[in-house]
Amino acid sequence: LHLDHGTYEGCYKCIKAGFTSIMFDGSHYPIDENVAKTKELVAVAHAMGMSIEAEVGSIGGEEDGVVGMGECADPDECKRVADLGVDMLAAGIGNIHGKYPANWQGLSFETLDAIQQKTGVMPLVLHGGTGIPADMIKKAIDLGVSKINVNTECQLSFADATRKYIEAGKDLEGKGFDPRKLLAPGAEAIKATVKEKMELFGSVGKA
């Protein structure tokens, strides 16, 4: 059970609640404070047998009601956080949460390459996977990205399938209003999206 974009306080709550993995998002703190809090949480999480992901460089878009512009992380700051012993590192490389605007400049592979050179074998995480072109995804993987988060695209697939079910009047046929039936098309749509992403990411058969 993983916590995504957790606050300092939220991480402690999830540690106590028995989560198996946490992500501490300290990207909005000055780097020294981010390092200090991350170091503390690494020690606590590892003592509990949990994995921990950290973030450097704020990832733009909207996540849990917070809106921001994508920025590129400083590779040297990434190394400082990676050296703390985190299990995964999320670094801003121009990626954002949610839908990408028409004027999006794309991922900064120069930044990603520099981060990979500084952090070595550290598994890198790409947030905001929705809408990134397949060729960019594959290049990011080649440059060290090991985990890609895709949320908005799954939600859009769910909403579209559920909308079609209701617009077709299926909820008015028999017991089509049963939540298990009403929500089933959306769930299947998410499965299809996940399968598509697994094939693109090269993660099929690696569970």
Q: What positions do the PLM features span?
A:
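Thr-Gly-centered strand-to-loop micro-motif
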Residues: L126-G128
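Active-site gating loops and adjacent loop-to-helix segments of metal-dependent hydrolytic enzymes
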Residues: E167-D178
